[in-house]
A protein has these predicted regions:
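Small-residue-rich helix-loop
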Residues: 60-62, 313, 323-467
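Active-site SXXK
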Residues: 57, 71-89, 146, 178, ...
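A small/polar active-site loop signature that marks catalytic segments
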Residues: 217-387
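Short, Gly/Ser/Thr-enriched beta-strand-loop segments that form substrate-interacting elements
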Residues: 210-232, 255, 293-298, 403-435
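Short, well-structured active-site flanking segments
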Residues: 85-100, 280-284, 385-388
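N-terminal signal peptide c-region/cleavage motif recognized by signal peptidases
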Residues: 21-22
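Mid-domain, small-residue-enriched loop/turn segments at the edges of structured enzyme/sensor domains
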Residues: 46-48, 105-179, 183, 326-371
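Beta-lactamase-like hydrolase cores
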Residues: 25-55, 61-68, 128, 133-137
C-alpha cells in the first residue's frame, strides 16, 4: 500500500451566509470520526472520506479523497451504475435450448444445446422453468448429448482458490456465460440435540451427490458457526464434520464444490428426472450450430431487478456477470469490459480507477473516495437514479445493512453499499440528514492492522445523518 497523505477538511462557502449550516470549518477530522479511527487503530492517512450534498458543487469533507484506494465491494457501485446507464434498466438476458430438429413422438434425436448469454440471475427455480418449457413443448426423451454453449464469453481459466484459498465458497465462483444457480449448492443444517447430532440436508437437487461425515450438536452460543465445520469434496462426495450449536437453529450452508460443467450436469439430470424426462447422453462443452432451431427459452428479469440483488446482498458472481455484459461485442472478454467502463468513467471526469472484475473481490481494484463520490453525484442526476438508489441496502432495514444503524439517526434514511475484505472496509451511498438534505457519503479504510473498521464508517454516516 503506498503511503497516503491526508488532506485537511475543507470548508467551502458560496456564499458563506447561506452555507454556515451545511459546512464544517475545521483543520482536523470531526471529533466523532477521529475518535473512532483512534479506537480502531486506523491511522488517518489510511482512511479516505468524501461528503457532499447532492445539490452542492463543493464537498463538505474531503480527507485523502483523491488517493486511489481499494474499495472492496463498494466497487459494485461502478459496475451496477455503468450497467444501468449503458444497457438500460429494461435490459434482459436469454438462455436458449436448441436442437438440430424438432422432437418426434417426444424424442429428441441428436444433441440438445443450452446456449447462455451471461444471465446473472438463472437460479434453480428459473432453470427448472426452462426445463419445464422443454417438457411442455413435447420433449420427454433426449437421445443425444447435452451441449453447454458458453460462446458468449471468452474467459481465461478461473482459479476459485486464488483470492483467499477458499475454493468452496460461492463468492469465489467465476463468471460464466451459462451460469446456473450462481454455481452454488445449498445445504441446510438442522440441529438434533436429542441425538447429539446435526442433520445435513441437500436442498439443491444434485444427481449422485453423497453426503458423508458427522456434525455433532453442541451447547453454547451460535457464534461463527461456519468456522466450526470441516468440509471436504471428492467427486460425488461431500464430507461435512465438526460441531454445530443447537442455539443456531437451522442454517443454510452454500458451497461451490464442482466445476461448472459438473454442477450443471448434476442439476440437469436431477431436475429432468423429476420432470419425468429421460436422458441417455453425456454432458459436454460445445457450441450450437448455426442451423440449430430454438425449442425453448428463458428470459431473465430486467436489469433494474438484477442490480438490486447485486447491491442489496453484494453478490459477487452476479457483479462479474454484469461487468462482462458491458463489453461492446461478443464474445465478451474482461479486457473489453475494462476498456469500455474505463472510458465511461473518463467521460464522467472520473480518472485513475483500476478495474479488475467489477465485484470488488480483488487486491488490484482501486478508486478514490472522490471518484466514488463523483459517481454517486452523477447517478443522482441521471435518468436511472431511481433504479440505482433503490438497489442499495437501507440502513437498519434490509440487505447487508439489516443489522446495522438500527438505533441511529441513519436508520431508514441512508442507502449505502458496503465493502469488506481483509484489510479493507468501505461504505458509500446517500444519507438523508435531520433537515431533509441528502448527502453523498463515501468512506474507505485500507489498513491491515485495523481492529474494528466498521466503527469509523458508522461514525461517519451517523455524523452526517445527525446534522
Amino acid at each position: 500500500m503506498p503511503d497516503m497523505r491526508s488532506t485537511l477538511i475543507r470548508f467551502f462557502a458560496a456564499p458563506v451566509l447561506l452555507c454556515v449550516s451545511c459546512a464544517v470549518l475545521a483543520a482536523e477530522l470531526p471529533a466523532p470520526l477521529a475518535g473512532a479511527l483512534r479506537d480502531a487503530k486506523v491511522p488517518a492517512n489510511h482512511a479516505a472520506f468524501f461528503i457532499q450534498r447532492v445539490d452542492s458543487d463543493t464537498p463538505l469533507l474531503a480527507h485523502n479523497a483523491g488517493k486511489p484506494m481499494n474499495p472492496a465491494s463498494a466497487m459494485k457501485l461502478v459496475t451496477t451504475y455503468a450497467a444501468l446507464d449503458l444497457l438500460g434498466p429494461a435490459a434482459t438476458w436469454k438462455t436458449e435450448a436448441l436442437a438440430a430438429s424438432a422432437p418426434r413422438d417426444g424424442k429428441l434425436e441428436g444433441p440438445l444445446y443450452l446456449r447462455g448469454s451471461g444471465d446473472p440471475s438463472l437460479t434453480l427455480e428459473r432453470f427448472w422453468l426452462l426445463l419445464r418449457k422443454l417438457r411442455a413443448r413435447g420433449v420427454s426423451e433426449i437421445a443425444g448429448d447435452l451441449v453447454l454453449d458458453r460462446s458468449a464469453f471468452q474467459l481465461p481459466a478461473h482459479d476459485p482458490a486464488a483470492f483467499d484459498n477458499e475454493p468452496l465458497r460461492p463468492y469465489n465462483a467465476g463468471a460464466d456465460a451459462l451460469l446456473v444457480n450462481f454455481k452454488s449448492l445449498r445445504l441446510t443444517l438442522v440441529p438434533d440435540p436429542a441425538n447429539g447430532a446435526t442433520r445435513v440436508i441437500a436442498e439443491t437437487p444434485a444427481d449422485g451427490l453423497r453426503l458423508g461425515g458427522r456434525v455433532a450438536s453442541s451447547d453454547g452460543e451460535c457464534g461463527d458457526w461456519r468456522e466450526k465445520l470441516k468440509i471436504g469434496s471428492n467427486g460425488n462426495s461431500l464430507d461435512i464434520s465438526g460441531s454445530f450449536a443447537a442455539a443456531c437453529g437451522e442454517k443454510a450452508l452454500h458451497l461451490s464444490p464442482w466445476s461448472a460443467d459438473i454442477q450443471i450436469e448434476r442439476l440437469f439430470r436431477a431436475l429432468w428426472r423429476e420432470l419425468g424426462g429421460t436422458f441417455s447422453g453425456e454432458v459436454r462443452a460445445g457450441a450450437a450450430p448455426a442451423e440449430a432451431r430454438l425449442i425453448a427459452a428463458h428470459e431473465s428479469p430486467p436489469l433494474s431487478e438484477i442490480v438490486r440483488d447485486v447491491n442489496k446482498w453484494s453478490n459477487n458472481v452476479m457483479a462479474r456477470q454484469l461487468f462482462l455484459a458491458l463489453a461492446p461485442s461478443r464474445p465478451a472478454t474482461p479486457d473489453a469490459a475494462k476498456a469500455r467502463i474505463t472510458q465511461w468513467l473518463r467521460d464522467k471526469h472520473i480518472d485513475g480507477a483500476i478495474l479488475d472484475n467489477g465485484a470488488g473481490l480483488s487486491r488490484e481494484e482501486r478508486i478514490s473516495a472522490e471518484g466514488l463520490g463523483k459517481l454517486l453525484l452523477d447517478a443522482w442526476k441521471s435518468p436511472v437514479m431511481p433504479e440505482m438508489m433503490a438497489s442499495l441496502p437501507i440502513a437498519g432495514s434490509d440487505g447487508t445493512l439489516k443489522k446495522r444503524f438500527g438505533n441511529s439517526a441513519a436508520a431508514g434514511r441512508a442507502h449505502l453499499k458496503t465493502g469488506y475484505i481483509e484489510g479493507v472496509r468501505a461504505i458509500a451511498g446517500y444519507v438523508l440528514d435531520r433537515e431533509g438534505r441528502r448527502w453523498v457519503v463515501v468512506g474507505i479504510l485500507n489498513d491491515a492492522q485495523m481492529k474494528n473498521g466498521s466503527a469509523p464508517l458508522d461514525a461517519l454516516v451517523r455524523w452526517v445523518a445527525e446534522r
